Amino acid sequence: MALNFPNIDPVIVKFGPFDIFGQTFEPALRWYGFTYLVGFVAAMWLLNRQADRSNGLWSREQVSDLLFYGFLGVILGGRIGYVLFYHFDYFLASPMYLFKISEGGMSFHGGLIGVITAMIYITWKQKRTFFAVADMVAPVVPIGLGAGRIGNFINGELWGRVTDVPWAMVFPSGGPEPRHPSQLYQFALEGVALFLLLYWFSKRTKKVGAVSGMFLLGYGIFRVIVETVRQPDAQLGLYWGLMTMGQILSVPMILFGLYLILRPEGKQ
């Protein structure tokens, strides 16, 4: 007996419609965007708290800079990565597809590349080492990841494969078959479990880059696990009949994460 997907309107409130220069606009606040906003505010609070306890190594102004450019990196990198990794054929046929944000579509791995680019800039601007910045950011990233997965669940998207487990759900866009609620698995692993793991690990190591390595390792492993029950992207399917794109992109994260954790102390 499958569970029914909760009928949650993805739109919290609509504004308008407004007529501007002959065009009708009806902006709306959606749960998906709201969950990311909550995650961003929570991450800002935690980073400011870390800055206050850093004995002068970080100021709140520097944290604000980090958050601003990090946010840009997530949005731009996430969208560009989604288009290039998962819908490159659409992009080749119509490059303007990149700007159709209203249709949805964000990639974690693209967002990660965007954040890394932002951190490189912050490294230069604030005259820090790259991993000093990365180790500051890594422990709060799971908050945004978890918030985003709740948004995916409310939208009824990114559901899992067909299953007969007792907690399987029938999703409105997933056909009549009961499926794994893989968004909730990702919330539990990439959000809650990874946050707790990084919090615990950050208290037990002072090695530069180790916390960043644990983030890469933990996320990569959790993503590979969940991808085994998450429905592969229809336009991509399985590579070699075995791996999803998400798993392929996670393998380098696992390997580099292991390197950062195990490399000799003091090696930059």
Swiss-Prot record:
Pathway the protein acts in: Protein modification; lipoprotein biosynthesis (diacylglyceryl transfer)
Cited InterPro entries: Lgt
A single GO BP: lipoprotein biosynthetic process
Compartments it resides in: Cell inner membrane
Binding site for a 1,2-diacyl-sn-glycero-3-phospho-(1'-sn-glycerol): R149
EC number assigned by the record: 2.5.1.145
PANTHER family: PHOSPHATIDYLGLYCEROL--PROLIPOPROTEIN DIACYLGLYCERYL TRANSFERASE, PROLIPOPROTEIN DIACYLGLYCERYL TRANSFERASE
A GO CC annotation given for this chain: plasma membrane
Bilayer topology: Multi-pass membrane protein
Keyword Ligase: no
GO molecular function term, any single one: phosphatidylglycerol-prolipoprotein diacylglyceryl transferase activity
UniProt source species: Shewanella oneidensis (strain ATCC 700550 / JCM 31522 / CIP 106686 / LMG 19005 / NCIMB 14063 / MR-1)
Coiled coil: none
Family named by the database record: Belongs to the Lgt family.
Protein name (record): Phosphatidylglycerol--prolipoprotein diacylglyceryl transferase
Transmembrane segments: 27-47, 66-86, 104-124, 130-150, 181-201, 208-228, 242-262
Major localization listed first in the record, in broad terms: membrane
Function: Catalyzes the transfer of the diacylglyceryl group from phosphatidylglycerol to the sulfhydryl group of the N-terminal cysteine of a prolipoprotein, the first step in the formation of mature lipoproteins.
